[in-house]
């Protein structure tokens, strides 16, 4: 099995799991063993999926400015979490 073949179903599962609630505040229920590459791949794709929905929310022209600021900070934190996770996943290839 190639790495791509490993990733694809994990990414699809994370997206499908997110869409069970369609809620950026839904808890992550990662089904993979902690600290496994599968766990990190699922988590990364969950963060990506939530991030896409954050971006949709913040583009609402009627968003309250105070809510937008709170969301902007969540987006910034999510971006950093994603960057840290990508670096961790990259370490599997070193």
Language-model segments: residues:
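Anionic, Ser/Thr-rich low-complexity intrinsically disordered regions
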Residues: 1-94
């Amino acid at each position: 099995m190639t790495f791509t073949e490993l990733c694809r179903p994990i990414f699809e599962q994370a997206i499908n799991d997110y869409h069970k609630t369609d809620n950026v505040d839904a808890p992550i229920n990662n089904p993979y063993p902690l600290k496994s590459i599968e766990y990190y791949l699922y988590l990364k794709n969950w963060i990506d999926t939530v991030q896409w929905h954050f971006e949709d929310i913040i583009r609402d022209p009627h968003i309250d400015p105070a809510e937008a600021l709170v969301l902007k900070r969540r987006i910034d934190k999510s971006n950093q979490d994603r960057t840290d996770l990508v670096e961790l996943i990259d370490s599997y290839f070193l």
